[in-house]
């Protein structure tokens, strides 16, 4: 088995930037984009709307579109992308070993760019109403039919909280912004925007202490510093209260700080283990910006290239750049109808295809519910399509846009995006919320195929 020069684990701004620089240095990097521990391919920018502070985009750019452009640039310079799942990392021997979807990859150098995941409040009632009114991603779940014209709440006082509060006014009103202090931590521009929005009500010096309701969230309880309490009747509660670094894969191997962030040399990407570098939010507890993550990815790649050269480990692969695929000019989605439905197609779109395959096809049917602004949906769909391609026609898939077909989503009990439902013989066999490992979907379908319908 050939040993890789450099493997990058993680595909946010840090991971893609590291890959771009490493590829331009002819290091032939391998970037593992798949479901990272606690994160999603593309990083946190996949769960944002307009990014307005990334240089070069004076009118702003959608987070998922920015990551598409980063991916295209990495591919242009020869980065090899592995859309698989990093399951384990072993730094105890050289070359380092990474287990990916059951196979082992060996590498001389490693850049860890696994990012961070959203924090929870751990409220009484939180587990019961998670995905039934409580969410950590307004951009993913805001279009859920149950939130239409309902009162909603966002917890937090930073840029993300303010952005999500303003974004949610597209769907519900009023939107209550719950801030635990007497001021916002957000940038001045974002703070001014949320204060000026008449559909946003700010509650200062308040904590959410309980969530309650029936089958769906109906209310939250706020508490003031003096112990006074107030009940807010809301159908949705969205968390924007910071993040925890995704470091489980290297716990006990790399030095971490008290909050779990990877410790590196001051101002540099090197970790305590030679040949291992960290970039982006996994090692940044202070700045946590897309542009700083990209900069740290650049640093990590340059440091890795120098380290490999110094130890005479680099095997250079000369490769000219290729023309990048156009990004931002996606083809319009064709919704299946009676005129264009192909009953043998692996992937189709719309409720007509769903009804037809649900009633007529004997094969397992994956139904994925998405929304236009859902970054994780953007990540998940290629993984599901890959599963169906591997199965070579033994299963099929349908995509439903919950904004365009909200009635279908409501009938299906969909409470956020992405949601995936697996059917066979008109029976719901399994359901998932959020991005999961590709192998999990494959195993579920394999289990159905192993048992006669």
Range-by-range predicted roles:
Residues 3, 122, 128-146, 240-287, ...:
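FAD-site-proximal beta/loop scaffold in flavoenzymes
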Residues 4-77, 160-188, 257:
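Beta1-alpha1 glycine-rich phosphate/pyrophosphate-binding loop at the start
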Residues 20, 162-164, 279-320:
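A conserved FAD-binding loop/helix module that cradles the flavin
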Residues 74-92, 98, 105, 170-266, ...:
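A Rossmann-like FAD-binding core segment of flavoenzymes
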Residues 346-364:
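A short beta-strand-turn-helix
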Residues 369, 388, 392-407:
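Thiol-based oxidoreductase modules, predominantly thioredoxin-like and allied folds used
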Residues 378-391:
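Typically the conserved alpha-helix immediately C-terminal to a functionally engaged Cys/Sec
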Residues 421-453:
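Non-catalytic, surface beta->alpha helical segment in thiol-disulfide oxidoreductase systems
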């Amino acid at each position: 088995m050939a040993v890789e020069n450099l493997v990058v684990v993680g595909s946010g701004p840090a991971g893609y930037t590291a890959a771009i620089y490493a590829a331009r240095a002819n290091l032939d990097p391998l970037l593992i984009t798949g479901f990272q521990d606690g994160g999603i391919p593309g990083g946190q920018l996949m769960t944002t709307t307009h990014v307005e502070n990334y240089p070069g985009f004076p009118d702003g750019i959608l987070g998922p579109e920015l990551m598409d452009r980063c991916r295209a640039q990495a591919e242009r310079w020869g980065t090899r992308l592995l859309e698989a799942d990093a399951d384990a990392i072993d730094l105890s021997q050289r070359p380092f070993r990474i287990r990916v979807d059951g196979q082992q990859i060996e590498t001389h150098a490693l850049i860890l760019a696994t990012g961070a995941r959203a924090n929870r409040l751990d409220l009484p009632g939180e587990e019961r109403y998670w995905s039934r009114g409580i969410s950590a991603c307004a951009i993913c779940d805001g279009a859920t039919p149950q939130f239409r014209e309902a009162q909603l709440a966002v917890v937090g006082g930073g840029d993300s909280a303010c952005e999500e509060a303003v974004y949610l006014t597209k769907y519900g009103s009023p939107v209550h912004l719950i801030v635990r202090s007497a001021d916002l931590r957000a940038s001045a521009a974002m703070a001014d925007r949320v204060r000026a929005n008449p559909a946003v009500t700010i509650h200062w010096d308040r904590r959410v202490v309980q969530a309650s309701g029936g089958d769906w969230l109906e209310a939250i309880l706020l508490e003031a510093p003096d112990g006074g309490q107030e009940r807010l009747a809301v159908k949705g509660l969205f968390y924007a209260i910071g993040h925890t670094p995704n470091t489980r894969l290297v716990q006990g191997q790399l030095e971490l700080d008290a909050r779990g962030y990877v410790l590196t040399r001051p101002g540099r990407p090197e970790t305590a283990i030679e040949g291992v570098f960290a970039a982006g939010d996994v090692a940044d507890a202070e700045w946590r910006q897309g542009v700083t993550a990209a900069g740290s990815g650049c640093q990590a790649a340059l440091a890795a290239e120098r380290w490999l050269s110094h130890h005479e480990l680099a095997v250079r692969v000369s490769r000219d750049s290729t023309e990048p695929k156009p990004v931002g000019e996606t083809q319009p989605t064709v919704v299946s109808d009676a005129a264009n439905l192909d009953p043998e197609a692996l992937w189709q779109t719309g409720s007509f295809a769903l009804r037809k395959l649900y009633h007529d096809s004997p094969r397992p049917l994956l139904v994925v519910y998405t929304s236009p602004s859902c970054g994780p949906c953007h990540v998940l769909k290629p993984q599901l399509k890959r599963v169906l391609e591997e199965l070579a026609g033994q299963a099929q898939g349908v995509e439903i846009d919950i904004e365009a077909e909200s009635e279908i989503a409501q009938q299906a009990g969909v409470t956020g995006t992405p949601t995936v439902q697996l059917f066979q013989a008109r029976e719901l066999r399994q359901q998932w919320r959020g991005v999961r490992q590709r192998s999990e979907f494959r195993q579920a379908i394999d289990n159905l195929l192993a048992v006669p319908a």
